[in-house]
């Protein structure tokens, strides 16, 4: 399991701390562009690279803050993850008021909620992997995604 952590450059420290916590406390791998030398590409090359990296992940966690309002990449990465039918959640580290389009997905505002997210993510991924043994890819992915959203919203009180 691997999570693509989408963030605006101003939120790099928060995104890195999230990636570290996911790994240290939950052994969940993540993709974070600050440690990727390829992320210095420009334009179409960068877009292609991000698509490739998203293709290696299972879901997207968007780190949002006041600075995200000026970002073009975070909404674009969310759009690519939506096309891929990946589970999506947001992390508002500075208690940022989320724009309407982000309220569609579960949102996290603390390390405790990040831990809940990690546990639910692992469980949904296990469901996906187990279902893939006897169901096709699309049905398995949909089942895991539905479980992810239902359980995470329920545990966060966002039902």
Identify the role of each PLM range:
Residues 1-57, 142-159:
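Conserved N-terminal substructure of TIR/SEFIR domains
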Residues 13, 95-159:
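C-terminal interaction surface of TIR/SEFIR-family domains
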Residues 24, 79-94:
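Arginine/glycine-rich "motif VI" loop of SF2 helicases in the C-terminal RecA-like domain
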Residues 40, 71-72, 97-102:
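Switch/connector loops and helix/strand junctions flanking conserved nucleotide-binding motifs
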Residues 45-47, 77-78, 103-107:
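Short low-complexity, flexible loop/linker segments enriched in glycine and/or proline
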Residues 59-62:
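Structural motif
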Residues 66-67, 91-98:
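Short beta-alpha junction loops
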Residues 66-84:
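Conserved TIR/SEFIR loop-to-helix hotspot centered on a Trp-containing motif
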């Amino acid at each position: 399991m691997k999570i693509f952590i989408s963030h605006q450059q101003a939120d790099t420290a928060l995104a890195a701390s999230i990636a570290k916590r996911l790994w240290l406390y939950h052994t969940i791998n993540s993709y974070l562009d600050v440690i990727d030398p390829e992320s210095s590409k420009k334009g179409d090359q960068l877009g292609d690279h991000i698509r490739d990296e998203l293709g290696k992940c299972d879901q997207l966690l968007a780190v949002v803050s006041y600075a995200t309002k000026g970002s073009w990449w975070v909404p674009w990465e969310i759009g690519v993850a939506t096309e891929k039918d990946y589970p999506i959640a947001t992390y508002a580290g500075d208690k940022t008021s989320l724009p309407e389009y982000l309220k569609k997905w579960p949102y996290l505002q603390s390390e405790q909620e990040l831990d809940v997210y990690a546990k639910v993510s692992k469980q949904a991924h296990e469901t996906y992997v187990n279902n893939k043994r006897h169901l096709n890819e699309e049905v398995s992915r949909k089942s895991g995604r539905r479980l992810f959203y239902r359980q995470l919203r329920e545990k966060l009180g966002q039902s």
